[in-house]
Amino acid sequence: MYMIENLKKAVKQVIGTGPSPAATQVAVRRRKPQTALFKDDGTVPNNPTLPLVHYRNAVRLTNSEDPAAIFERLFESNGWKGTWRDGIYDYMHYHSNTHEVLGIARGEARVRFGGDKGKVIAVNAGDVVVLPAGTGHQRISASRDGAGFIRPCTSKQLPALQSVISGPGRSFRWSPRASSSAHCDRI
């Protein structure tokens, strides 16, 4: 299924179709984020200073548009390069030097964040989750339609993080230090 999704994405990029920037901005809903800070659990380092940030129902998805394309346009316009369509692995893992943003394009899932001693959070179509480098994540269950996650991973952390999670009257001032290449550590 993900091969088909990625093929569709490639064709749309070549022929120049997809949601317009205006349609993408209309889809964004201002939401107050929920945050969680996880401690090192001995296996998963998590991030000692930056919280996981979860925006519920942050993107209005319509049946007329490819929901994954809306997330791709939104994330790429905010500095998150290299988007891809995939799911969350069913084993605990983390990215030691790269922040990640997840856009749930369809379906619903239960995801454990923060390692085995972390927290299981339900995510649904339209949700956005920002994971700072080191944050463990694992798919526990997903709906039959295969909760479609759009997971851009980038090495341009600071501008992207600030633009994704800033809102009227508030701004997270994060100062991450990381190398320029993505890295995934499986537990």
Regions found by a protein language model. Name each.
Residues W80-K81, G87, R106-E108, G114-D116, I140-I187:
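Double-stranded beta-helix
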Residues Y2-M92:
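A short, N-terminal "cap"/entry segment at the start of jelly-roll beta-barrel domains
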Residues V111-R112, K119-I121, Q138-R139:
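Short, solvent-exposed loop/turn segments at secondary-structure junctions
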Residues H95-R112, V130:
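Short, conserved beta-strand element in jelly-roll/cupin
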Residues V123-S143, C153:
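Conserved metal-binding segment of the jelly-roll/cupin
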Residues G87-V101, D116-K117, N124:
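A short beta-loop-beta micro-motif enriched in histidine and acidic residues
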